[in-house]
Amino acid sequence: MTIRKVLNKYWGWTFLIVPLILQVVFFYFPMFQGAFYSFTNWTGLTYNFDFVGINNYKILMTDGKFMKAIGFTLVLTLALIVGEIVLGIIIARALNAKIKGKTFFRAWFFFPAVLSGLTVSLIFKQVFNYGLPAVGSALGIKFLETSMLGTANGAVIASIFVLLWQGVAMPIILFLSGLQSIPSEIVEAAAIDGADSKQTFWSVELPYLLPSISMVFIMALKAGLTAFDQIFALTGGGPNNSTTSLGLLVYNYAFKSNQYGYANAIALILFIIIGIVSVLQIKLSKKFEV
């Protein structure tokens, strides 16, 4: 076989070499390196460390901060999944109706998606700390006179609200696209058969929205389990670690306490959780595809 024939046969593979090298160097190598360090007491400050086996994982089981972070992360993730799906469908159905100015409203609801999560959190931090208390004082509304971020329950609610306010923008577009993909003949046939809005949704619209729901589920799951920058800017994990997510906990142990080995153990647990849930969700979603 001549050189020209070899090049012609394998030329396409040469375009994959650079991406594969980059993926190995910047994804797979750090991933396996992090998994290795999770079995050490590495501080990140020197090259000296001791192999401690599964000791870091044993400590996790009795770490109050870790358990608290697990609880908040699960609450946040569940709220985002339910909120983005339910609100996304409701708003998408409203925007799909024949209303005046729907182009404006579609752009309005999508606007939060183009903003930086950090910027949104910093803006809402000022609103919760100064804006709402000022309004509460002016109107004599007692529960608004103090910052929501000053109490554990208030900070949790504020965190969910901010992430949901920005996170629901993309699901609205996805659900709107799904609704517009429904053949008009099917909708008209349902109307002729006497189906009301509720019956049309459950029997006609929902089956076409299932692929979008599956995608939104994964997006919300990832956003909840990996939440970091918004929480970091909005509450910093406080008060009293009530809004510390797993991502923020990894950051605190790694960069504030210099416990890189322990932080990698938490990160690996988070990676495994996301992987398992994602695989199960993808398999289940295939059973409901139209």
Curated annotation (Swiss-Prot):
Q: Which GO terms describe its cellular component?
A: plasma membrane
Please report the record's description of how this protein sits within the membrane.
Multi-pass membrane protein
- What is the protein named? Multiple sugar-binding transport system permease protein MsmF
| Function (record text) | Involved in a binding protein-dependent transport system responsible for the uptake of melibiose, raffinose and isomaltotriose.
Question: Where's the ABC transmembrane type-1 domain?
Answer: 70-281
The record lists the membrane-crossing segments as: 12-32, 72-92, 104-124, 156-176, 201-221, 231-253, 260-280
Q: What family is this protein classified in?
A: Belongs to the binding-protein-dependent transport system permease family. MalFG subfamily.
For the keyword Transmembrane helix, the answer is: yes
Alphabetized UniProt keyword annotations: Cell membrane, Membrane, Sugar transport, Transmembrane, Transmembrane helix, Transport
Instruction: Tell me where on the tree of life, at the top rank, the source sits.
Output: Bacteria
Classification via CDD domains: TM_PBP2 (cd06261)
The organism named in the record is Streptococcus mutans serotype c (strain ATCC 700610 / UA159)
- One GO-annotated biological process of the protein: transmembrane transport
